[in-house]
Amino acid sequence: MHSRHDEYHKLTRGERIGYGMGDFAQNLVFGTIGGFLALHMLTVNTISTATAGFIFLFVRIINVFWDPMVGTYVDKRTSKAGKYRPWLLRAGVPLVILSALLFAPIPGVKGSVAFAFIIYLALDLVYSLVNIPYGSLNASLTRDPESIDKLTSTRMMLANSANLLVYTLFPMFVQMAAPKDRSLKDTGFFGLELNLGNYTDPSANYAWFGVYAIYMIIGAVALFICYKFTKERVVATAEQTANVKTTDLFHELRHNRPLVILGMFFMLAFTFMFFMNTVNGFFNQFVVSHSEWMGAVGLVASIPGIAFPVFWPKLKKIFGKKGFFHLFLAMFIVGELLTYVWSREGMHDALWLAYIATFIKQWGLTSATGFMWALVPEVIAYGELKSGKRNAAIINAIMGLFFKIGFTIGGAIPLWLLAVYGFNESGAMQSASAIDGIIMTAVWIPIALAAISMVIIQVYPISDKHVTDINRQLDEIRV
């Protein structure tokens, strides 16, 4: 039986890194899917824009029913290795295999809507079996608030290290392996020139798969490290576990107001994040015509997410929880406005502007969307105080639903907007209308959603003092 002292365990650096490897793995696997699958589907796999959008939408609708079942199933069961940890291995291996299949150049299925749909659906269902237990594991490591803040900083540093591999190096590696239209190009890495090919041509299919397969091997190793170096301490009692029901989801939604508010913030944050990520490749390829810069610009943009999370706990103390989010959401908006300046005629070749705009934008984005995960354990504790049940997996399933709704909106609607604006999947050049559509989805819609997010987080009710009071009351109840 776990002691109260064990529940307030001060996490070591090794434990924080071990858990953070789970974020590293999932960003490597699913971040690449979110950032580049649409581009691959449309240009290399030659699936139409509208069809790809409907694939993303339909799979997310299924998630609405699937995720609560996963949350309930996980919360009702435990094993010798723990309640949540085993799923990192049980579902982790199928996750990386299915992910690789989405980019696999299999003869006879190129352009097959049925194949793309089935594999993407299976991948998304399996992803829930990894992501929901992983999110629940976060709240079971410790109840110490200081350790939770430090854990959030560490895991986001590792998550953004994976983003460096995804958004910075992945497109460059694929272009290095792409066979068509190869030429020596300035990468923007301080004069570094590389022989790069056209990665949006169907002939680049083996290049995509080869690079992604290597990423999946790294992701599988990272999931194993996460499993090996984590320990569950804050766990539900046997009575709480036995009493878990699927209807607990509706109870949490009705009575856990902080959960609903945080969920809405998650939904909006992931919506504007994936609006931007979905069309990032299109923006670089067709608006500013500098896809060869994606590696260099992405490298500069990755610095805030890797180097600065260590300062998050201190900044939260200075500005407060809500002030922290307001500061970095405002910074994101400023970066987006500078991105719009970069998109204007005559500014496309301004590499310095690309660096500054993306650096500021990503600093705001990674901080606001990274630190929000630190609020999930306190929402779980609040729910336990109100209901008497520690429904960690169910609450993480609810959070997963919110962020997947955002992921869906941010992944599907941009593609439909591009179709409305006249995007040509096979065209090397795009019309002025299509360019306007890319800018709308990459800049203006994310700005509007970020502004709404600032309003949502303002009404979030749990302060740091409330967290201390909640933990004290839970201690008294358990004693």
Locate each region found by the language model:
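Membrane-embedded alpha-helical bundles of multi-pass transporters/translocases
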Residues: H2-V479
